[in-house]
Amino acid sequence: MDKKKLYIFLDVDGVLNNTSTFRLNRKTMYVLSHENLVAYQFLIDKSMTKYDVKVILSSTWRMYKTGINKLSKFSKKYNGLVLCGKTPDGVDYREVEIKDFCDNHNINYDDILIIDDELIDNELKKRHLRTNCHEGLRFSDVMNWLEKEGIK
């Protein structure tokens, strides 16, 4: 039996990094936090027990080769960074870009997870795991979402 698909719309800043990461790496905007990456990969690994996980990059990193290359480099260690797509480069609010992506690809809103530190305030908000930009994605965020999804 095929697993149900789960499309994860991934933001990077405020999810896979945090304010401490930026303070320690002032030379570049494209930084990742080991702690946040480990929490994210744990979410991916656990989610894959129930779902066929597809990661869509919704971060502004999608618009810059430097950002895409950084994620690609880390994808060798963290398979949760293997991307199957990205939202179109647009000027709309993130939730509008994600909604349009879903509509254009016939993706049911119940089959998505948006991991983002920005507020999602439309019909997608019930599928939003909101992080805190100061801390990024924490294990407590991951555990709460896994429990909500019935994943052990």
Label for each model-derived stretch:
Residues 1-152:
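Catalytic phosphate/metal-binding cores of nucleic-acid and nucleotide-processing enzymes, i.e., regions
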